[in-house]
Amino acid sequence: MVVKSALLFVLAAVLEIGGAWLVWQGFREHRGWLWVGAGVLALGAYGFVAAFQPDANFGRVLAAYGGVFVAGSLIWGMVADGFRPDRWDITGAAVCLLGVVLIMYAPR
């Protein structure tokens, strides 16, 4: 269950962050409406991923995903845009990921 859940979180992050990045590139960086359209499709696909999480609680899944989004956004920025996080960015992302573990995988 944990592996499936973690993989779904990664897929959700790639779709959401990637989709938002494509929209950004298409609109703000003037790369064209095809980029924007691809971003919208990726964002739409992201909307379905949470439904496949093993946990049945929507609020829990989306709250935990928020932590993955924070860390994933920093990683995406590093890879795609040359962003260099500082120690506070990294510390904040680590705190968020700890929150993911507590919210999703703590014994209940």
Curated annotation (Swiss-Prot):
It comes from Mycolicibacterium gilvum (strain PYR-GCK) (Mycobacterium gilvum (strain PYR-GCK)). The keyword Transmembrane applies. It is a multi-pass membrane protein. One of its GO terms (cellular component) is plasma membrane. The keyword Transcription regulation does not apply. The chain crosses the membrane at residues 7-27, 32-52, 61-81, 87-107. This is UPF0060 membrane protein Mflv_3127. It is found in: Cell membrane. InterPro entries: UPF0060. Keywords: Cell membrane, Membrane, Transmembrane, Transmembrane helix. Belongs to the UPF0060 family. Pfam families: UPF0060.
